[in-house]
């Protein structure tokens, strides 16, 4: 009896070629495809996997689990790698790895294969997660092992009658899920080349966006968006709704050269319409619901959390601890944020919360002012005392210092 290998199967070039390669190596291939909100026709993927020679194909709808257990932390933690990338692909990898391990254990497979190259981040994310969840499973990386170029893969697919949706003229590598869309390769590898419009799918070009703005009210409950204009949604449906609405206005395009875990720089084109709107609104709500010290410290945790996720360390003690901290900050992050969507911009123009720490009577400069300005004199004396003592001891500061 042949040994079984579970393959993370997407139906794209890398994994379609990998099926044939694993079969040639003498394995039975168990294909596994997850739906994490990308809108892919999974019936076609299922049929294609079997047509390619897989002995089984498991289709798993993990969209709700993805939104509730993973995207929720991206929102509560305002997660952005290098202050630019909302972790579109990185966010889905630990969930995919988890499901692959479950299928491998269910089918008595000896290992798990993926279609990642040897120069990308995903190989690390998948294999580190798999080792954390089940160290006895072997990892197989066909694309990394054969070290083919993208052009050689395409030629191999053509030679073996493997249907793929890309060609030499449009060799994009695309990954999409509920939280957004990532695109690389082809002309995008030149960091000075303007991305052509065929590199985008979720967002309109600015020239094609409406000339009238849409204004929405996004309601949050403990850090999670739950309503648009008073209508309640499950998180996954809310994100899909915002993707369509914000994408219509050209919101969420990101052109970023990022520092990969493996040490190289990579130019990526991302589309994340809902993510841009939600994260801006969430940050705005936090400005009135978090205390100053938490508001100043939380970004430090957010940066570390984003790097943990980007670097494939979701299943780690540190990440578990970071999640607990993030959760503890969100107890009172509830309320409404008003946002205008227009010509590529998500503009926050109002926020309110039953737990607001903003006191208008303390902030106002009108006659309603309740702030005790006399208290400022003593505060300044105490606050500036260390500087004053230092200056007296060392003779003060000159303009040259």
Swiss-Prot record:
Record field: catalytic activity: L-citrulline + L-aspartate + ATP = 2-(N(omega)-L-arginino)succinate + AMP + diphosphate + H(+)
Pathway note: Amino-acid biosynthesis; L-arginine biosynthesis; L-arginine from L-ornithine and carbamoyl phosphate: step 2/3
GO MF annotation: an example: argininosuccinate synthase activity
Enzyme class: ligase
SS bond list: none
Gene Ontology terms: cellular component: cytoplasm
Binding site for L-aspartate: 117, 121-122
EC number: 6.3.4.5
Keywords of this entry: Amino-acid biosynthesis, Arginine biosynthesis, ATP-binding, Cytoplasm, Ligase, Nucleotide-binding
Entry-linked CDD domains: ASS (cd01999)
InterPro entries to which the protein is assigned, alphabetical: Arginosuc_syn_C, Arginosuc_syn_N, Arginosuc_synth, Arginosuc_synth_CS, Arginosuc_synth_type_1_subfam, AS_cat/multimer_dom_body, Rossmann-like_a/b/a_fold
Residues bound to ATP: 8-16, 115
Localization in the cell: Cytoplasm
Biological-process GO terms, alphabetical: argininosuccinate metabolic process; L-arginine biosynthetic process; urea cycle
Source taxon at top rank: Bacteria
Residues at which L-citrulline binds: 85, 121, 125, 173, 258, 270
Listed PROSITE patterns: ARGININOSUCCIN_SYN_1, ARGININOSUCCIN_SYN_2
PANTHER family named in the record: ARGININOSUCCINATE SYNTHASE
NCBIfam families in alphabetical order: argG, PRK00509.1
Subunit field text: Homotetramer.
Family: Belongs to the argininosuccinate synthase family. Type 1 subfamily.
Protein known as: Argininosuccinate synthase
Organism: Staphylococcus aureus (strain MSSA476)
Gene encoding the protein: argG
């Amino acid at each position: 009896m042949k040994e079984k290998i579970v393959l993370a199967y997407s139906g794209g070039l890398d994994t379609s070629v990998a099926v044939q390669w694993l079969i040639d190596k003498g394995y039975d291939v168990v294909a596994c495809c997850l739906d994490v909100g990308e809108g892919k026709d999974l019936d076609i993927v299922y049929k294609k996997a079997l047509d390619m020679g897989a002995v089984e194909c498991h289709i798993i709808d993990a969209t709700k689990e993805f939104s509730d257990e993973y995207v929720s932390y991206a929102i509560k933690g305002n997660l952005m790698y290098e202050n630019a990338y909302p972790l579109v692909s990185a966010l889905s990898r630990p969930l995919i790895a988890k499901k692959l391990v479950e299928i491998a254990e269910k089918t008595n497979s000896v290992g798990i294969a993926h279609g990642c190259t040897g120069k990308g981040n995903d190989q690390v994310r998948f294999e580190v997660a798999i080792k954390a969840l089940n160290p006895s499973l072997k990892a197989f990386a066909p694309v990394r092992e054969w070290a083919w170029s993208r052009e050689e893969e395409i030629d191999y697919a053509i030679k073996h009658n493997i249907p793929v949706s890309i060609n030499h003229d449009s060799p994009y590598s695309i990954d999409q899920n509920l939280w957004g869309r990532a695109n690389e390769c082809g002309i995008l590898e030149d960091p000075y080349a303007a991305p052509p419009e065929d590199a985008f799918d979720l967002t309109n070009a600015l020239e094609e966006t409406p000339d009238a703005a849409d204004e929405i009210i996004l309601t949050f409950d403990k850090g999670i968006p739950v309503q648009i204009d008073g209508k309640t949604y499950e998180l996954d449906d809310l994100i899909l709704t915002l993707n369509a609405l914000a994408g219509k206005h050209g919101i969420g395009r990101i052109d970023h050269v990022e520092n990969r875990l493996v040490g190289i720089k990579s130019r990526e084109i991302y589309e994340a319409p809902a993510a841009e709107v939600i994260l801006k609104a969430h940050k705005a709500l936090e400005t009135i619901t978090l205390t100053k010290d938490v508001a100043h410290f939380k970004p430090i945790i957010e940066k570390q959390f984003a790097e943990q996720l980007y670097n494939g360390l979701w299943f780690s003690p540190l990440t578990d601890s970071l999640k607990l901290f993030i959760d503890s900050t969100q107890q009172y992050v509830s309320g409404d944020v008003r946002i205008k969507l227009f010509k590529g911009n998500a503009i926050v123009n109002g926020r309110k919360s039953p737990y607001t720490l903003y006191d208008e009577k303390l902030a106002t400069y009108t006659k309603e002012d309740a702030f005790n300005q006399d208290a400022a004199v003593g505060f300044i004396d105490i606050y500036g005392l260390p500087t004053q003592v230092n200056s007296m001891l060392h003779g003060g500061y000159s303009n040259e210092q």
